[in-house]
């Protein structure tokens, strides 16, 4: 059976990927499930559960169980701390906030979670996490040395270091609810030299923004706030998903 990472890599080779981020600290389990169900209808490829809110494993269990009862999509944990783990998920982004000024977020939470995770039969996906200006909550909580949104050299330096460390993915984050996203020029420059997939999230609210990032080379686009705040998640997400899938089709052709 194909692993979650293998499925991701296959999808990025053949086009572009959209992921929907759901924060179980912001919504009750059944509402998380409704968002996931409508996101699947809109064409999203994976569901991420987590975010900047620090919640416990019980809340993660409840949210993920509710989501998996409503959708066939793979569920990936996007942890904000060592407490945000669950055996109910299909995979977890085992991630390091490389530009944090605190070792707790570079490796500390990861060490605390390692033994509990070893007992869980979920896939662990090594991912480098880089927080850009303005950073929002995750930048503040994670004590990030924010990368300017248009700083190509710093972004490339971190991304290459991540690749050389052996991370399988790199995630460029502007922060949940950010007024703007990481610059297209940064994504374009990094993709010229990087061999591993680039995920971009934060501040992506429109089909035009998502399409521009996909055209710049982003392999995966993450949206979260727009889904959480929309009464009709399908109507909010479908145009965004379609915009990046169109770029993916042109990539194949």
Curated annotation (Swiss-Prot):
The keyword Metal-binding applies. Mg(2+) binds at residues 23, 52. Cannot use Mn(2+) or Zn(2+). It is an enzyme of class 2 (transferase). It comes from the Archaea. One of its GO terms (biological process) is glycerophospholipid biosynthetic process. It holds the Pfam family PcrB. GO terms for cellular component: cytoplasm. Optimum temperature is 55 degrees Celsius. Optimum pH is about 7.0. Active from pH 6 to 9. Signal peptide: none annotated. Sn-glycerol 1-phosphate binds at residues 171-177, 202-203, 224-225. It catalyses: sn-glycerol 1-phosphate + (2E,6E,10E)-geranylgeranyl diphosphate = sn-3-O-(geranylgeranyl)glycerol 1-phosphate + diphosphate. Its main location: cytoplasm. Keywords: Cytoplasm, Lipid biosynthesis, Lipid metabolism, Magnesium, Metal-binding, Phospholipid biosynthesis, Phospholipid metabolism, Transferase. Pathway: Membrane lipid metabolism; glycerophospholipid metabolism. Its EC number is 2.5.1.41. CDD domains: PcrB_like (cd02812). Belongs to the GGGP/HepGP synthase family. Group II subfamily. HAMAP family: GGGP_HepGP_synthase. Prenyltransferase that catalyzes the transfer of the geranylgeranyl moiety of geranylgeranyl diphosphate (GGPP) to the C3 hydroxyl of sn-glycerol-1-phosphate (G1P). This reaction is the first ether-bond-formation step in the biosynthesis of archaeal membrane lipids. Cannot use sn-glycerol-3-phosphate (G3P) as substrate. This is Geranylgeranylglyceryl phosphate synthase. It comes from Thermoplasma acidophilum (strain ATCC 25905 / DSM 1728 / JCM 9062 / NBRC 15155 / AMRC-C165).
């Amino acid at each position: 059976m194909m692993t979650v990472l293998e499925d991701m890599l296959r999808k990025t080779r053949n086009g572009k990927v959209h992921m929907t981020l759901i924060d179980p600290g912001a919504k009750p389990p059944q509402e998380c499930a409704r968002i996931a169900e409508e996101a699947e209808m809109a064409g999203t490829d994976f569901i991420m559960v987590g975010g900047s809110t620090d919640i416990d494993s019980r809340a993660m269990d409840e949210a993920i169980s509710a989501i998996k009862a409503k959708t066939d999509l793979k569920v990936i944990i996007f942890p904000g701390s060592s407490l945000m783990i669950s055996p109910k998920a299909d995979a977890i982004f085992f991630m390091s906030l490389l530009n944090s000024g605190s070792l707790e977020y570079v490796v500390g939470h990861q060490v605390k979670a390692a033994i509990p995770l070893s007992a869980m039969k979920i896939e662990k996906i090594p991912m480098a996490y880089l927080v850009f200006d303005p950073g929002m909550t995750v930048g503040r909580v994670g004590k990030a040395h924010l990368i300017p949104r248009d700083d190509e050299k710093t972004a490339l330096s971190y991304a290459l270091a991540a690749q050389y460390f052996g991370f399988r993915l790199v995630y460029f984050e502007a922060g949940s609810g950010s007024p703007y996203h990481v610059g297209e020029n940064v994504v374009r420059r990094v993709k010229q030299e990087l061999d591993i997939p680039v995920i971009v999230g934060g501040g992506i609210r429109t089909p035009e923004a998502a399409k521009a990032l996909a055209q710049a080379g982003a392999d995966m686009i993450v949206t979260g706030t727009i889904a959480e705040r929309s009464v009709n998640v399908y109507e909010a997400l479908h145009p965004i998903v379609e915009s990046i899938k169109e770029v993916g089709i042109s990539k194949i052709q």
